[in-house]
């Protein structure tokens, strides 16, 4: 067998084994050294391949796809800095427990550490952020094919295990790289036996089930029975089924629920926006929780952590579906690794309903509405609120970091009885790759997605706009343009004008309308809340991607946030004094 033949077979069995493991979505960036892998993936009848000129965009797209599906996409790139461009998304995938599979092509052994062109130290490049990193040898008939299949199967099981995360396979190839016609009857494959005639993977790993132990459920039920004022917190939850189970638990036990925007429950009609209530120190003091059940991961807002430090609950119990530590405020007294859905359902069957629950705060909703009248200019606050009210229940929502995710968490209104798939990159909370992540999320959901994003995040990933023309589902991109880093206006450094604007405000003065034109994307810039509502309704009903720009001034936005929040606090304080 000649070199071209073994290289072709080598690449084919890698792709074939991934497909047999139901890993069929490939994000490919053009490159020479990765030619064997690219051709194998492109020619396979059961793969879906999307091409990305930019590796960073490819990796964030794969991240968004994983958030939507719970399954990894496969990243294929050439040698050199290509694999390094995946790094930010790999970090987010690792911190956010999202599966991802990187196949980086590399120069062969004899070219490494020699000064050869486009050759870097790729093996292990992601360090501790990779769940597993492995070097595959150059294609050779001396290597049994079952060794390759076994490595692929282990890579798949590792990236999808608990905790899920990125896995990196670095694969060296010698020239020539061009494939030859595939020979599935090659003698090299004869040792595989039944694999050749079946469609099953070479080996399977049966994942450990994270069903709750009855002792854990009984212990939490016992503590719950003795609690006078328990509280449920829904933190970051990826799966709607988990979110629904937590909501059902809150309802069946009549326990107040704090639903973070990352929980998928914040927009649900049966939740109460405790984010707004907790602006008031009096409200927090008068609603002290002595037991807190925290389901899922981290929270967007700071108020729960501050409340925990004030309350010092007798018991703070975290239930999460992974073994990683979660104790940002060091108040956790018990941590349980189990399926969130299974634990919530078991606890609902074991426990008795509580006697009281936090009252709805409808007056607070009315106060926010007063600041978001239809004839008023559209603001950062009203944009988030209007999106939360008008988003199609059959669509998805992706939120950029910095102010968009915070405004949606604080000021959103309840939209209906359907759980709207909601995603954000809160593992490491970077502002990079947001458009790509939202595009991947939409692709995985196979439904339209609304993206709420700031101007700096938009600029950071603007090259991803070229991906959207080939999308089968559209994005509605709402860009909050306050000409800089608006969140820094809320920090103490904003009081030092000699350094603030240049180093933190960072005005960019770029033209979003021109960017939309350059990428042939529909664009609107509505001036009022009524006009924005009309524009958003039209965009969400369109089959094409569109950009809606919301222009804002950072100083006015800061003043509005302070004025509205103080108005909410005053009303809440009056309620608590009655």
From Swiss-Prot:
It comes from the Bacteria. Binds 1 thiamine pyrophosphate per subunit. Keywords: Magnesium, Manganese, Menaquinone biosynthesis, Metal-binding, Thiamine pyrophosphate, Transferase. It catalyses: isochorismate + 2-oxoglutarate + H(+) = 5-enolpyruvoyl-6-hydroxy-2-succinyl-cyclohex-3-ene-1-carboxylate + CO2. Its EC number is 2.2.1.9. Its cofactor is Mg(2+); Mn(2+); thiamine diphosphate. GO terms for molecular function: 2-succinyl-5-enolpyruvyl-6-hydroxy-3-cyclohexene-1-carboxylic-acid synthase activity; magnesium ion binding; manganese ion binding; thiamine pyrophosphate binding. Pathway: Quinol/quinone metabolism; 1,4-dihydroxy-2-naphthoate biosynthesis; 1,4-dihydroxy-2-naphthoate from chorismate: step 2/7; Quinol/quinone metabolism; menaquinone biosynthesis. Catalyzes the thiamine diphosphate-dependent decarboxylation of 2-oxoglutarate and the subsequent addition of the resulting succinic semialdehyde-thiamine pyrophosphate anion to isochorismate to yield 2-succinyl-5-enolpyruvyl-6-hydroxy-3-cyclohexene-1-carboxylate (SEPHCHC). This is 2-succinyl-5-enolpyruvyl-6-hydroxy-3-cyclohexene-1-carboxylate synthase. It comes from Prosthecochloris aestuarii (strain DSM 271 / SK 413). The gene is menD.
């Amino acid at each position: 067998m000649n070199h071209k033949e073994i290289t072709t077979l080598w690449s084919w069995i890698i792709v074939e084994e991934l497909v047999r493991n139901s890993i069929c979505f490939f994000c490919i960036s053009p490159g020479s050294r990765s030619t064997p892998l690219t051709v194998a993936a492109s020619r396979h009848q059961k793969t879906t391949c999307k091409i990305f000129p930019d590796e960073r965009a490819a990796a964030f797209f794969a991240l968004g796809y994983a958030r939507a599906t719970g399954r990894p996409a496969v990243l294929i790139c050439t040698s050199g800095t290509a694999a390094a461009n995946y790094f930010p998304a790999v970090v987010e995938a690792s911190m956010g427990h999202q599966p991802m599979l990187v196949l980086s092509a590399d120069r062969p052994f004899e070219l490494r550490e020699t000064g050869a062109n486009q050759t870097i130290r790729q093996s292990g490049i992601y360090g501790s952020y990779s769940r597993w990193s492995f070097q595959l040898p150059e294609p050779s008939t001396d290597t049994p094919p079952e060794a390759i299949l076994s490595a692929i199967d282990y890579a798949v099981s590792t990236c999808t295990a608990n905790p899920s995360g990125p896995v990196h396979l670095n694969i060296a190839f010698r020239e020539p790289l061009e494939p030859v016609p595939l020979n599935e009857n090659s003698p090299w494959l004869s040792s595989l036996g039944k694999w050749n005639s079946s469609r099953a993977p070479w080996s399977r790993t049966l994942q450990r089930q994270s069903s709750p132990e009855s002792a854990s459920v009984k212990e939490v039920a016992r503590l719950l029975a003795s609690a006078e004022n328990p509280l449920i917190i829904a933190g970051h939850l990826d799966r709607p089924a988990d979110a629904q189970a937590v909501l059902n638990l809150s309802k069946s036990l009549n326990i107040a629920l704090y639903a973070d925007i990352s929980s998928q429950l914040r927009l649900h009609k049966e939740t109460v926006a405790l984010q707004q209530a907790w602006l008031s120190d009096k409200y927090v003091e008068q609603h002290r929780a002595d037991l807190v059940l925290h389901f899922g991961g981290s929270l967007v807002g700071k108020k729960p952590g501050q409340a925990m430090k004030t309350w010092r609950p007798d018991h703070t119990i975290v239930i999460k579906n992974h073994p990683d530590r979660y104790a940002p405020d060091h108040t956790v007294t018990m941590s349980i690794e189990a399926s969130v859905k299974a634990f919530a359902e078991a606890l609902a069957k074991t426990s008795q309903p509580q006697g009281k629950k936090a009252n709805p705060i409808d007056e607070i909703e009315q106060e926010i509405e007063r600041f978001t009248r239809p004839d008023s200019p559209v603001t950062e606050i009203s944009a988030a609120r209007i999106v939360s009210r008008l988003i199609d229940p059959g669509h998805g929502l992706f939120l950029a970091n910095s102010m968009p995710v915070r405004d949606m968490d604080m000021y959103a209104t309840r939209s209906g009885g359907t759980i709207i798939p909601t995603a954000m990159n809160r593992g490491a909370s970077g502002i990079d790759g947001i458009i790509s992540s939202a595009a991947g999320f939409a692709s995985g959901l196979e439904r339209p997605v609304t993206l709420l994003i700031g101007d700096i995040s938009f600029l950071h990933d603007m090259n991803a706009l070229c991906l959207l023309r080939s999308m089968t589902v559209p994005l509605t991109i709402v860009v909050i343009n306050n000409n800089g880093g608006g969140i820094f206006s809320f920090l103490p450094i904003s009081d030092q004008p000699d350094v603030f604007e240049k180093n933190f405000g960072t005005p960019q003065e770029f033209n979003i309308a021109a960017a939309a034109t350059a990428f042939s994307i529909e664009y609107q810039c509505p001036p009022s809340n009524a006009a924005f509502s009309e524009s958003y309704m039209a965009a969400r009903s369109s089959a094409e991607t569109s950009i809606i720009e919301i222009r804002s001034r950072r100083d006015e936005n800061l003043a509005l946030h302070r004025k509205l929040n103080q108005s909410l606090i005053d009303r809440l304080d009056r309620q608590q004094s009655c």
